[in-house]
Amino acid sequence: VLGLARAMARELGPDNVRVNCITPGLIQTDITAGKLTDEMTANILAGIPMNRLGDAVDIARAALFLGSDLASYSTGITLDVNGGMLIH
């Protein structure tokens, strides 16, 4: 999907069409509710610099940003929304 998005960004850029990706970290949703024990949650949070799980609003805000004029010169990018979980 990421490669396809980059290819589309390159192809559609001349037409002023922006194509970007959002890669979410662990997000609290109805699907994840009740699945993580306290110990599992503590272990996960230990690896997230922001010390919390994400929620749907975090992803929605990223999408709003990418769709706004604030990101008017951004195309072909991957925006990690994971609280810093994948900092290398």
Question: Which residues are covered by each model-predicted region?
Answer:
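A short C-terminal helix-loop "cap" of Rossmann-like NAD(P)-dependent dehydrogenase/epimerase domains
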Residues: 34-48
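Conserved catalytic helix of short-chain dehydrogenase/reductases
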Residues: 1-11
